C-alpha cells in the first residue's frame, strides 16, 4: 500500500514522504490515526505545493533570523542589575525571562525566552556572561550580558 505521511512516524519517515507499507499496517494503524493519507496524483501534487511553501517560509525565516542576529550582536551593552549578597552571589538567579527583558531594555528585539541558552541552567553570580540565542536551527546569536549588583 502506497501512502503519504502527514506526521512524523518513527522508523518510517517525515511528513510529506511517500512510503510503501504493508496493507494491514496502513489500514489498521496509519490511516485511522491520521498519520497518513492514500497516495494519489492529487495528493502528491498537494504535498509538492506544501513543500514549496515550506521551503519559501524556511528561507524567509532564515533571512529574518539573520536580521535578528545582527540586531542582537550589534547591541553595545546589555546589562542587568540584581540584588546580591556582599560576596557577589545573587539572591535567587538570572533566568531566561530576565535576559529577554534585558535585551529589550537595551534596545534590542523582543526574543522568546525559550530560545535563550544560559551558560549553566541559571546565572548565580555577578560579572560578564556569554549568552547564546537560538533564532533558527542554522542561526545562533551570541552576546555578553553584564550582571551588576543593584544599589541598595
From Swiss-Prot:
Keyword Signal applies: no
Record InterPro entries: Ribosomal_bL9, Ribosomal_bL9/RNase_H1_N, Ribosomal_bL9_bac/chp, Ribosomal_bL9_C, Ribosomal_bL9_C_sf, Ribosomal_bL9_N, Ribosomal_bL9_N_sf
GO MF annotation list: rRNA binding; structural constituent of ribosome
BP GO annotations: translation
Domain of life, per lineage: Bacteria
Classification via Gene3D superfamilies: Ribosomal protein L9, C-terminal domain, Ribosomal protein L9, N-terminal domain
Entry GO CC: ribonucleoprotein complex; ribosome
One Pfam family of this chain: Ribosomal_L9_C
Keywords noted in UniProt: Ribonucleoprotein, Ribosomal protein, RNA-binding, rRNA-binding
Function as written in the Swiss-Prot or TrEMBL entry: Binds to the 23S rRNA.
Family to which this protein belongs: Belongs to the bacterial ribosomal protein bL9 family.
Listed HAMAP family: Ribosomal_bL9
Name of this chain's protein: Large ribosomal subunit protein bL9
Organism field: Nocardia farcinica (strain IFM 10152)
Upper taxonomic lineage: Bacteria, Bacillati, Actinomycetota, Actinomycetes, Mycobacteriales
Gene name linked to the record: rplI
Amino acid at each position: 500500500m502506497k501512502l503519504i505521511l502527514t506526521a512524523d512516524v518513527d522508523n518510517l519517515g517525515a511528513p510529506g514522504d511517500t512510503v510503501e507499507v504493508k496493507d494491514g499496517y496502513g489500514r489498521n494503524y496509519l490511516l485511522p490515526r491520521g498519520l497518513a493519507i492514500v497516495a494519489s496524483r492529487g495528493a502528491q501534487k498537494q504535498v509538492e505545493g506544501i513543500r514549496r511553501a515550506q521551503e519559501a517560509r524556511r528561507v524567509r525565516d532564515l533571512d529574518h533570523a539573520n536580521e535578528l542576529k545582527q540586531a542582537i550582536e550589534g547591541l553595545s551593552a546589555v546589562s542587568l542589575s540584581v540584588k546580591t549578597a556582599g560576596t557577589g552571589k545573587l539572591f535567587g538567579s538570572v533566568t531566561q525571562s530576565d535576559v529577554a527583558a534585558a535585551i529589550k531594555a537595551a534596545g534590542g528585539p523582543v526574543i522568546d525566552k525559550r530560545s535563550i541558552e544560559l551558560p549553566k541552567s541559571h546565572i548565580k553570580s555577578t560579572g560578564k556572561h556569554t549568552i547564546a540565542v537560538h533564532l533558527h536551527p542554522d542561526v545562533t546569536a551570541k552576546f555578553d550580558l553584564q550582571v551588576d549588583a543593584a544599589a541598595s
